[in-house]
C-alpha cells in the first residue's frame, strides 16, 4: 500500500513539470493547423459522396427491412385474426357436439329406462300368468285328490256295507241293464 502512495506522489511531481511544457502555439505555420484544416476539409469533401452513398444505401436497406417487417407484422396479425376466428368456430362446434352428446345420452338413458319398464311389465305379466297356471294346476290337483279320496271313501264304505249277496244282486241288475241296451 505504501508503494501505491509513492507511485502517486511521483506522478503528481512529474505532472507539474509536464504541465509547464504544454501550451498553445500561436504560430499557425509551425503548428500545421492550416495543413490539418485543409486535410480535414478535403477528407470531408471526398468522403461526403462516398459516405453519403453508403449511408443512402444503408438507409434504403433499413427502410426496406422496416417495410418488410411491417408487412410480416401485418401478415402475422391477419393470421392471428384468422386463428382467433377459427378458435371461436371450433369452440362453437365443440359446444354443439357437447350439447348433442348430452341430448343423445339423455335419450339413450330414457330409452333404457323405458325398455326396462317394458321388460319389468313383461316379467310381471309372465309371473301373473305362471301364477294363474300354477293355481289352475293346484286346483286341478286338489280336485283330483278330493275325487280320489271321495272314491276311496265310498269304496271303503261300499266294501264295508256290501256283502256277497248284495254283490250278486248288483251284478245281476247290471247284466239285465246290459241286455236291455243290446
Curated annotation (Swiss-Prot):
What extra comment accompanies this record?
In plastids the F-type ATPase is also known as CF(1)CF(0).
Q: Does the keyword Transmembrane helix apply?
A: yes
Q: Which domain of life is it from?
A: Eukaryota
| Predominant place of localization | plastid
Assembly and partners?
F-type ATPases have 2 components, F(1) - the catalytic core - and F(0) - the membrane proton channel. F(1) has five subunits: alpha(3), beta(3), gamma(1), delta(1), epsilon(1). F(0) has four main subunits: a(1), b(1), b'(1) and c(10-14). The alpha and beta chains form an alternating ring which encloses part of the gamma chain. F(1) is attached to F(0) by a central stalk formed by the gamma and epsilon chains, while a peripheral stalk is formed by the delta, b and b' chains.
**Membrane topology note:** Single-pass membrane protein
Family per record: Belongs to the ATPase B chain family.
Compartments reported by the entry = Plastid, Chloroplast thylakoid membrane
TM annotation in the entry:
33-55
Q: What is the name attached to this protein's record? A: ATP synthase subunit b, chloroplastic
One cellular-component annotation, GO: chloroplast thylakoid membrane
Q: Which Pfam families match?
A: ATP-synt_B
Disulfide linkages recorded for this protein, renumbered to the chain, are none
Q: What is the lineage of its organism?
A: Eukaryota, Rhodophyta, Florideophyceae, Rhodymeniophycidae, Ceramiales
Against PANTHER family, the record matches this protein to: ATP SYNTHASE SUBUNIT B, CHLOROPLASTIC
Q: What does this protein do?
A: F(1)F(0) ATP synthase produces ATP from ADP in the presence of a proton or sodium gradient. F-type ATPases consist of two structural domains, F(1) containing the extramembraneous catalytic core and F(0) containing the membrane proton channel, linked together by a central stalk and a peripheral stalk. During catalysis, ATP synthesis in the catalytic domain of F(1) is coupled via a rotary mechanism of the central stalk subunits to proton translocation.
UniProt GO molecular function? ATP binding; proton-transporting ATP synthase activity, rotational mechanism
Instruction: Answer whether the UniProt record assigns the keyword Metal-binding to this protein.
Output: no
Q: Which gene encodes it?
A: atpF
Keyword annotations from UniProtKB, A to Z: ATP synthesis, ATP-binding, CF(0), Chloroplast, Hydrogen ion transport, Ion transport, Membrane, Nucleotide-binding, Plastid, Thylakoid, Transmembrane, Transmembrane helix, Transport
Amino acid at each position: 500500500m505504501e508503494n501505491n502512495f509513492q507511485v502517486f506522489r511521483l506522478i503528481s511531481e512529474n505532472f507539474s513539470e509536464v504541465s509547464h511544457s504544454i501550451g498553445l502555439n500561436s504560430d499557425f505555420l509551425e503548428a500545421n493547423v492550416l495543413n490539418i484544416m485543409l486535410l480535414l476539409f478535403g477528407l470531408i469533401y471526398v468522403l461526403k459522396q462516398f459516405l453519403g452513398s453508403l449511408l443512402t444505401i444503408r438507409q434504403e436497406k433499413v427502410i426496406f427491412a422496416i417495410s418488410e417487417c411491417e408487412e410480416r407484422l401485418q401478415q402475422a396479425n391477419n393470421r392471428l385474426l384468422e386463428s382467433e376466428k377459427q378458435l371461436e368456430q371450433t369452440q362453437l362446434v365443440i359446444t354443439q357436439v357437447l350439447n348433442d352428446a348430452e341430448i343423445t345420452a339423455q335419450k339413450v338413458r330414457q330409452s333404457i329406462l323405458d325398455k326396462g319398464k317394458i321388460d319389468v311389465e313383461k316379467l310381471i305379466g309372465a309371473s301373473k300368468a305362471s301364477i294363474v297356471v300354477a293355481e289352475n294346476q293346484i286346483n286341478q290337483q286338489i280336485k283330483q285328490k278330493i275325487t280320489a279320496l271321495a272314491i276311496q271313501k265310498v269304496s271303503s264304505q261300499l266294501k264295508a256295507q256290501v256283502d256277497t249277496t248284495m254283490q250278486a244282486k248288483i251284478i245281476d241288475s247290471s247284466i239285465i241293464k246290459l241286455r236291455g241296451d243290446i
